[in-house]
Amino acid sequence: MQQTTFEESRYHWQDSLENVAVCLPFRCPRCGDHTRFRSLSSLRAHLEFSHSYEERTLLTKCSLLPSLKDTELLRSSELPKQGKVLRGHAKVTKQKSSYVNLYSISHGHSKDTKPFEMVAERPVSYVQTYTAVDIRADSLDAPCASPGLPTQDTKAAFEAHVREKFNRMVEAVDRTIEKRIDKLTKELAQKTAELLEVRAAFAQLTQKKQEVQRRERALNKQVDVAVEMIAVLKQRLTESEEELLRKEEEVVTFNHFLEAAAEKEVQGKARLQDFIENLLQRVELAEKQLEYYQSQQASGFSCDTSEHMLTDIPSNRKPRCLSRGHQHSVCNHPEMRAHFHLKGRSYLKKAKDERAGMQPAKAIHEPAESPREFFRPAKKGEHLGLSRKGNFRPKMAKKKPTAIVNII
């Protein structure tokens, strides 16, 4: 990833800058940026060949002697003999010689130096050509020397002085340019490193941003799911609360129903107890009447019995009528009530057993009669023992008197 970012960070302007810095680092100060050179020697040769401003200035300020013109003519006549290689550099030779003569005339000093010292880093072809031209010029100037013109030593000293000064200037310029190039190279490397760091930081921040966006989307999905779940749970909670309210209402209704049923049960129990007590009283009265009838049958006073029963009918009806709303006065006593209950239960059991034993005989002679007919009193002239034991009585005797039915 970092390698890709580094490759992307290289732009075309960097390549072009590197190409310019490596290929053509030096430019001509007079021609401008469109004229650039690969090395200082090429720039120096260009300046010497194309821009000779000092020579032109000296030529305009000073007047040349006729001997100088003759010397130039002689040198120009000897130049075609040097061949094709020396033809391109003939102009340089004339300019150098005229420059040396003018300088020696104006200043008039000389130094013993060698005329063949050349500047370092000059092309080999230029050095050879310049040396050959100087040798040829010296050989031509030797016989033409005159007392009024500068000598060869003065010319050589001036050339050496100019070369030394030019070399020092070029070296200073070279050092300055090299320092500036080194400084710019360091700054460029520093800026490139900073740019790479910024690119790496930008890529890292981009990755972090993408990661944050991904986490944000995941959290948004989780929040949406949580909101949906909360909504579903709220709906379920509402439904549960409504169902709970319905159940509570049902429970309240059921409690009311149970309370009403309990009240009805209590009332029913009370009514049943009253009914049983009334029934026991009636059974007790029937038992007393039966005992009385049996005692009358045993004594044989049937007539008195019928009259007595007719006289006792109102008294027997009274307890029954009173039992509907009021109990009999005898049953109000607790001891008598317990006694009556025990006697009533024993009598009911006894009557049930007797009925079960007499039912087959009754089915042979006549159809079954109602239980009330079993306790029907005998009429006048009718034997009571037969009616109790065997129920052998005629069909005409089945008619019940109204008084006996009301008693039971």
UniProtKB/Swiss-Prot annotation:
GO cellular component, one term: cytoplasm
Deletion consequences: Basket cells with reduced branches and short processes in the somatosensory cortex of adult knockout (KO) mice. Reduced expression of the gamma-aminobutyric acid-synthesizing enzymes Gad1 in the somatosensory cortex of KO mice. Delayed myelination in the corpus callosum of KO mice during the postnatal period, but recovery by adulthood. Decreased dendritic arborization and increased spine density dendrites in cortical pyramidal neurons of adult KO mice.
Keyword Cytoplasm: yes
Tissue specificity comment: Detected in several tissues, with highest levels in brain. Also expressed during embryonic development. Expressed in cerebral cortex, hippocampus, striatum, inferior colliculus and thalamus.
Phosphoserine: residues carrying this PTM: S16, S139, S146, S370
Coiled-coil region(s): 170-298
Any one GO biological process: gamma-tubulin complex localization
Induction description: Induced by gamma irradiation.
Pfam families registered for this protein in UniProt: zf-C2H2_FBX41
Modification Phosphothreonine occurs at: T176
C2H2-type ZnF: 26-51
Cellular compartments annotated: Cytoplasm, Cytoskeleton, Microtubule organizing center, Centrosome
InterPro entries registered for this protein in UniProt: FBX41/ZN365_Znf-C2H2, GenomicStab_NeuMorph_Reg
GO MF assignments: protein homodimerization activity; zinc ion binding
Keywords: Coiled coil, Cytoplasm, Cytoskeleton, Metal-binding, Neurogenesis, Phosphoprotein, Zinc, Zinc-finger
Job description of the protein: Contributes to genomic stability by preventing telomere dysfunction. Involved in the morphogenesis of basket cells in the somatosensory cortex during embryogenesis. Involved in the positive regulation of oligodendrocyte differentiation during postnatal growth. Involved in dendritic arborization, morphogenesis of spine density dendrite, and establishment of postsynaptic dendrite density in cortical pyramidal neurons. Involved in the regulation of neurogenesis. Negatively regulates neurite outgrowth. Involved in homologous recombination (HR) repair pathway.
PANTHER family: PROTEIN ZNF365, ZINC FINGER PROTEIN
Subunit structure and binding partners: Homodimer. Interacts with NDE1 and NDEL1. Interacts with DISC1. Interacts with PARP1. Interacts with MCRS1.
Name listed for the protein in its UniProt record: Protein ZNF365
UniProt organism field: Mus musculus
Species lineage: Eukaryota, Metazoa, Chordata, Craniata, Vertebrata
